[in-house]
Every structure is written in structure tokens, then in C-alpha cells.
Amino acid sequence: GLPAVVLLRHQSEAERRRLLRKVLIETGKTATEAAYIWTRSPARLERLVVEIRGQEHLDASLAQGRGLIIASPHLGAWELMGVYWARRLRLHSMYRPPRQQEYEALLTWVRERSGAELLPATPAGIRRMYRALTEGHVAGILPDQEPPEAGVFAPLFGQPAKTMTLLAKLSQRSGAPVIFGFAERLPWARGYRIHFLPAGPEIADPDPERAAAALNRMVEACVQIAPAQYQWTYRRFRRQPDGRNPYHGQPL
């Protein structure tokens, strides 16, 4: 499958198969835990977080007083990240409205019940996000969603990937620092470990392609911590510069 190929292109076929098996198991966990996260109280969900690594990066970024962008890839329990941090920070989360409009009200309720403001990825939503950052608030963004229109190609695990430029623009205009974070799912239902990784200044480089490459390097750094927990079923590489589709003939 493509997940195994991009992660283990220099490893043996047996190692690729082992990873692919783990990916399928973790994908199933992602689907089943989403319903749990959506239906349990935020206070109950908070107790599932048993460890935070990199808290000092979060604290140092907040101490700058210029707002903060938390980039959380589709890795581990990304729904839990929003619930957990909305109770601690003035969080505004960007989202892409679902194709099935009947689900939008449900998703908005689920994600705002902890206190976050959910903003659609529209011009009005982006303006509101920028204002929130200038007021010292926190913006939550999924950095690995393929942009529908704007964006540039940048390498991700050695494969070209259409990558957003929104995060870099928000950081450039507002001066807000950027950190990456995700909730790693621990084995045997032992809870979740949150990781924070600081992004360097290149994440807001004025050159869109350099900024996008820096963004994808940070996504890679997160994924390498828990590679099987990445949402490889999201066809991140389906748009290529030469128009080909690398997923043809792939099981995922």
C-alpha cells in the first residue's frame, strides 16, 4: 500500500506489511473512538490525557503574547486535541464544511461544546481567525488537508503533496508563532499522550514553497513518532504535478 511505500521505501517487504497491518488496526481505532469522543463530556475526556510532552514549547509560545497557531495533523486522536485545549485556551478552530450539509450542525455542536469557536475555511472565517490571533488567542489548524484551490506542491515523505499556504500567511501577518501538536493513542486503552513540537521561523517564510516544505517537514516529524496512527486513508497525494494518480491499484 502507499502508506508503507512512502514511509518504508528502503525497508523490506515484510516490514512494509507489518506497518500496513498496524495502519489498518489504528484506522479502525480512529473510527470507533470518534463516536466516544463526540458523545462523552469534555471533563471525562480530559482524564484520558495521561501525559504531555513538550508543554514547555506551548508555554514559551504563549508567553510571547502574539497569539499562537497550533497545527494538529490527522494523527492519533485529533478530535481529542480540540476538546482538551478548548477548555484551557481561547481556541478558534478552522474547519472545512462537510459535503453533506446535514452533518454540519452536528459537527459544529460537537466541536464547540468545549468552548472553541469553529470557523469555516472561507474568506470571512479566515478574517475572523486573523483577528483572533491579533487579540492574542489561539488558532487550531489541520495542516495536512489538501487545499481545494490555493496551495503549492511541496515534498512530504519524498512524494509531492499539494500543501496549504494559509498557515504561513496567518503567521506572517499576525506574528503568531507556530507549534505542532497531536494526541498519541497509547496501547491497551491506557489513554493518550499529547506531544508538542516547535516549528522554526521557516514555517512563515515569505516564499510559499519554502514555507510549505517547512510545514511538511513538521508533519513528517510528528508522524515519525507514531507512524501507524496517521490517517493514511486520506488520499493526501492524489493530486500530482504531472496529473498522475499514485493511488491507482493501491488498497488504501
Regions found by a protein language model. Give the residues of each.
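General small-molecule cofactor/ligand-binding pocket signal
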Residues: 51, 119, 197
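A transmembrane-helix-recognition feature enriched in membrane-embedded lipid enzymes
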Residues: 1-6, 19-43, 229-233
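Non-catalytic C-terminal accessory region of glycerolipid acyltransferases
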Residues: 10-12, 16-24, 59-64, 87-88, ...
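A short, well-structured juxtamembrane/interface segment
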Residues: 3, 38-68, 76
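Catalytic core of membrane glycerolipid acyltransferases/transacylases, capturing the structured
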Residues: 10-18, 22, 30-37, 64-123, ...
